[in-house]
Amino acid sequence: MIIDADYITEDGKPIIRIFKKEKGEFKVEYDRTFRPYIYALLKDDSAIDEVKKITAERHGKIVRITEVEKVQKKFLGRPIEVWKLYLEHPQDVPAIREKIREHPAVVDIFEYDIPFAKRYLIDKGLTPMEGNEELTFLAVDIETLYHEGEEFGKGPIIMISYADEEGAKVITWKSIDLPYVEVVSSEREMIKRLVKVIREKDPDVIITYNGDNFDFPYLLKRAEKLGIKLPLGRDNSEPKMQRMGDSLAVEIKGRIHFDLFPVIRRTINLPTYTLEAVYEAIFGKSKEKVYAHEIAEAWETGKGLERVAKYSMEDAKVTFELGKEFFPMEAQLARLVGQPVWDVSRSSTGNLVEWFLLRKAYERNELAPNKPDEREYERRLRESYEGGYVKEPEKGLWEGIVSLDFRSLYPSIIITHNVSPDTLNRENCKEYDVAPQVGHRFCKDFPGFIPSLLGNLLEERQKIKKRMKESKDPVEKKLLDYRQRAIKILANSYYGYYGYAKARWYCKECAESVTAWGRQYIDLVRRELESSGFKVLYIDTDGLYATIPGAKPNEIKEKALKFVEYINSKLPGLLELEYEGFYARGFFVTKKKYALIDEEGKIVTRGLEIVRRDWSEIAKETQAKVLEAILKHGNVDEAVKIVKEVTEKLSKYEIPPEKLVIYEQITRPLSEYKAIGPHVAVAKRLAAKGVKVKPGMVIGYIVLRGDGPISKRAIAIEEFDPKKHKYDAEYYIENQVLPAVERILRAFGYRKEDLRYQKTKQVGLGAWLKF
């Protein structure tokens, strides 16, 4: 099983290293024969001798083309002859490529920006994470004394925790009498002990939570200050930091550094991404949070160190559990796109699609288009096109609602209509599909590059799902599920990739044709559905909600199932409408904002959720009760009464302060904030008192009654004293409770001012319930 690949240099020559796990043992394979190359398209082949003479300089050394070879390729499906230009070292490519491109005889150069080790994996057909080797995992976490505003890495690391299958341990340099704590003499010895632990346990995968931007950069900084090395790599190298967009990424040679933070940010949508919040969202278990100022106080006074050690141990344990949960999916994505987990886990879906396409292009002898330069990128960003069809919803409270949607609408359109850059407006074509409204033509004489790959992916997914049904082995079933989910992620990203401004296979015409066909098919379903006696309540891109006013639930379900069968007989190719479900009751506020309840009593909302941390508990609680009154009891009047009661209690200061706390996260050093919001103002006041505030810290505050801006009246929850302080009732009514429910009750004719306890407006349910 290939874990990773890179290259080293010996005597000026590159040597590919393949890090592998084989029969339970780690090994490294070397290849000294692979050479870097780029492609050049010439105006006239006779100019190749001139091109061969092009030289450049790199670190005082002359860079030259070592060999040339004429090759037959395809470019967007059309035959093309290009020259393959070999160089001595991968770093020669950036040194010489612009000189080659600028030569008068050169039309353009291609595939000059594919990293050498990744090029090797593609060309040799090697796939990381293939095989059944059992990998070993170790989670690592650190606790520091880091003061906001001070130099990064100035404060010491006070604890390092680690966890694996054997359990979790903490290393520290102050005496703590706990069975899982190991005490050493100094911070220096603690870091050296971590190195020893990693070398002894020799994990294949090191799991962290934000290790790219905090744990490892901090460890490296402290090791440097203390004059010690951090040889964590299997080749005894130190962790290597590199820029990746706005963030850092840390690589450990011979091991997979699996940072959960970017993976979880890409995979799930949460109001906050603290380790505690993620753990609760995934496993439904709570974990105590110990704040930075509490850690500092415990370390300085010696009181409460056991609590900090337990917190540190749990950090490592939770990171390990989360790592084991998320790693298999990233491993399957790595197998699918053919690049290492380290890269895949830090990639956007657009980049995952691109690596997959680069590999498949090589297999099919296709020359990959170049990435856009800055000017072309800016031009693409300015381009726009019409998206999916969204129908304004029918207002009111509805009963007996069916949900119908297309199975993989956009991938199905791409395959059915052969939507691809190489089929677009193709000359000498016998059969075309013409996109409605936009008029772009796609050749049907041959399968397009991207539609054929997408078709293979969807076919493979169906086979995997079939095997899952047949399999009786739970382990195999789980692995197959990870595989089919990885395919789904990739398949659903192709439409977005066509419109991704940085894409090699960017195709605005393809993207707008896909949405045009999407609008046509959903409109066809709408018209046919209305002809069948249904009332369409809401449409959004690939799905819709409908009912038959006055009909019984079973009749609505039965007719909907018959309709699905009928419409699918009329739809072309892979297009297929599915019966998604039945809802007892629901209402639609505006586009992408609605709430439904199924027959089991489960409430489903979209666009109405106030899950962000900057909503107080009282706002969330009131909204939940309002939804329950409307959907479970069918009683809008009851919902209004609930809001009035809450606003009355707020006005009379009868709501406990813990329900008024607003949480916001500090996302950057305090000195970098230009706009001072309430959470920043509170954080600055805490920092002035010696509390260690750092990026990632969540600030909880309550807004007090008084004059002046909110930022001056916000107080940290820890400092709020009910005997001394009064919360600002008007702020919580106008900026928390009413906005949370107004968007719902507006659908039933209520305005914000109608919902306060001192103002009333009687509107009965009968005016809104449809029969």
Swiss-Prot record:
SMART domains listed in its UniProt record: POLBc (SM00486)
Alphabetized Pfam families for the sequence: DNA_pol_B (PF00136), DNA_pol_B_exo1 (PF03104)
Protein keywords: DNA replication, DNA-binding, DNA-directed DNA polymerase, Nucleotidyltransferase, Transferase
Molecular function GO terms recorded: DNA binding; DNA-directed DNA polymerase activity; nucleotide binding
InterPro entries: DNA-dir_DNA_pol_B, DNA-dir_DNA_pol_B_CS, DNA-dir_DNA_pol_B_exonuc, DNA-dir_DNA_pol_B_multi_dom, DNA/RNA_pol_sf, DNA_pol_B_thumb, DNA_pol_palm_dom_sf, DNA_pol_type-B
Keyword Nucleus included in the entry's annotation: no
Broad EC category: transferase
Reported impact of residue 532 to R: In strain: ST 855
EC number: 2.7.7.7
GO BP: DNA-templated DNA replication
Catalytic activity line of the entry: DNA(n) + a 2'-deoxyribonucleoside 5'-triphosphate = DNA(n+1) + diphosphate
Domain of life: Archaea
Gene3D superfamilies referenced in this protein's UniProt entry, alphabetically: DNA polymerase family B, C-terminal domain (1.10.132.60), DNA Polymerase, chain B, domain 1 (3.30.342.10), Helix hairpin bin (1.10.287.690), Palm domain of DNA polymerase (3.90.1600.10), Ribonuclease H-like superfamily/Ribonuclease H (3.30.420.10)
Family in the record: Belongs to the DNA polymerase type-B family.
Protein name per its UniProtKB record: DNA polymerase 1
Species for this entry: Pyrococcus abyssi
Gene: polI
